[in-house]
Amino acid sequence: MISTFNIRYRHSLMTPLASMTVSIALLSAAAGNVHAMSKKPAPPAPPSAAQISAATNSVHDLAQGCYAIQSPANGKYMNRFDQGGLVDNGLSYQFKATSAASAARFYFKPTSYFHYMLTDQDGRYLASHLPNEVSAGRYAGKFAQWRVGGHFQNDGSYRYSFHGIGLNKVLRHNYGGIGWYANGGAYVLDILNPTNANSETGFNLVAQNDCKPFPEADLNVDESVSQTSDVNLPVRGAIDPHTHITSYEFMGGKFLHGEPFSPWGIETALRDSKEIHGPSGALDLIGNLMGFNDVNHRYDTRGYPDFPEWPARQSLSHMQYYYKWVERAHKGGLKMMVSLLVENEVLCNVQKTINPASWINPNNCQTSKSIDLQIQRLNEMEAYIDAQQGGPGEGFFRLVSTPAEARQVIADGKMAILMGIEASELFDCGIRDHCTKETIEAQLQKVYNAGVRTLYPTHRFDNQFGGARQEDGFINVGQWLATGRFFETETCDAETRGRYFKSGFPLIGDVPVIKDILNLIGLNPVYDESQPLCNQYGLSDLGVYLVNRMIDMGMIIEMDHMSTKTANAVMEIVQARNYSGVISGHSWLNSAADGSPHAVHQGIATQGGILAPYNSPSTSLKGGIDRYLALYENTAYLKAVPFSTDMGGIGNQAPARSDAATNPLLYPFITEEGIEIDKQVTGNRTFDLNNEGLAHYGLVADHIQD
């Protein structure tokens, strides 16, 4: 009132001009106030790069979680309902549940980074199908796979979108009254609502706790105990220097059934093997011959969840490295694996010929192509395990390429995986191949850049790097197929025990009529059967080049499978250059004449390399370890010897101890790190080391304890 009075009092004393000026000023001020009152609030600031990144990466945190999907528009939840029809029993999803209690609850199973399959309480998949429908799917696969996006909201929360991989369309909710899917429909395409009016693509995820877990192998270990350590202290634990995680891709990818992981889960990774092995394993010719010494061996091919006959220690053509089994081995004290990428062009071409399953879309038998694929698979496996455990870098399975990386990974409580190559035609340098220093160098650089750090210069057969350790029988047939010649032998030197060879074409050279034909065409080699023999070939000039380049690059030279002449020549180079990166990873060198370790073994120990016996039951394995430990006694190096499984390398695994029935490994047991481990369960099968030996890689934990 005082202000009004004052204005009026002053106004009475003003001239008309002054009065008009004041009036205009007051009117302008009033108009300004009206404009200020009608102006819209400033829009919120766009999210920062850090906020966008946090929302995007929050998708990783959904792994193995349980959530209800809620509409931000009306607060309703997705629920399953019967829409009728034949597809997926007429079941689909909509947004009509008024509470989380009545909503569908989805288990989020990662398939890769940012990609998930969602299964409800009954194991039905949030899925899509042709032509453009959402349904409660019954099967894993790309139509049940969604790329999930995380989106930052102004209140600091996140919303999530779902892009279907099978149809390449986004999941939507129609909360309005227009269109085929009006009033709560979940859809990907609505021709009656082409502009997607009153629909949304971003949803709230409300945490729940009563989902049905996705099928998976159990670890059966106490996961509460940390395996972290001080990176500056010595590493304690076990290493397996000879494994073949990716051997399911060698020999055309149609020999070893199963995968260590699958985006679609264990039901796909460890499915029935009849698709490549035929009914009752009738087409599993190499597996039956090598594992059971009987090409007519028959077995029940069923896999998950029953596993009536595989995995087993003699079942060489079935997957034993499922990723959860590998994780269990890590929990049991295994700190590092050398995963050898493997190929054998002869066996690959034989398999592609004799097994009809290999006639359709087999992998390339060329060694370099096969190795490339296996490197890709190991990287995919690392990413898959990361996705299961919370995103990039979070998984226990870590590819490493330096000692420092390996030590850091182990200190972080994870497993270090080092890549190597074991192939008879390394770098496409079989006897019949065109191979030069230039082609070798190009391939060497390529695999080094991919993370490979260990190589076998020779494997089963002679190649352009040198002579292989001689073997008769099936391997000698392979030598002939690979090189055009059988093993050409000579009397061994006085320090070396060789192998006995039988004259004639291996396996069939004594068969009447066939023998005469083979003699006629010169395919019945003649050997001195009175004494053990050695390969007459040693290290070639190209082999000298390769070994020196490996030393230049700090790579590990695998000595196994070398002829004694080749091995002696390599050790001369290694000793001259004072190099320690040499290893006999699975006891596949010739022994001394009296059966004791060869001078090559002693040379490896003296240089600071690694010696590892091939695995066997714990009672006999001790002798193999002691045999090599003695070679380190007079050296300055760590007195330690690992064992190698060579699982996946077409070699039988360790059986149970002969006294396991009366003196069994007791379950549960406590590891050196204080982790409690019980019998491993996968699906409906329980594995017990006492009964079946090393049936799969998860039992390495049990074997270490034994």
Predicted regions and their residues:
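Catalytic beta/alpha-barrel core
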Residues: I556-M562
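N-terminal secretory signal peptides that target proteins for export/translocation
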Residues: M1-M14
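Lectin-like carbohydrate-binding module/patch detector with strong preference for beta-trefoil
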Residues: M37-F214
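Bacterial N-terminal signal peptides
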Residues: A18-A29
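N-terminal hydrophobic targeting/anchoring segments and the immediately downstream early-domain regions
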Residues: M37, L205-C534, S540-N548, D552, ...
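Boundary at the C-terminal end of the N-terminal hydrophobic targeting segment
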Residues: A31-A36
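Histidine- and/or cysteine-centered catalytic micro-motif in compact active-site loops
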Residues: Q121, M562, S587-L589, Y614-S616
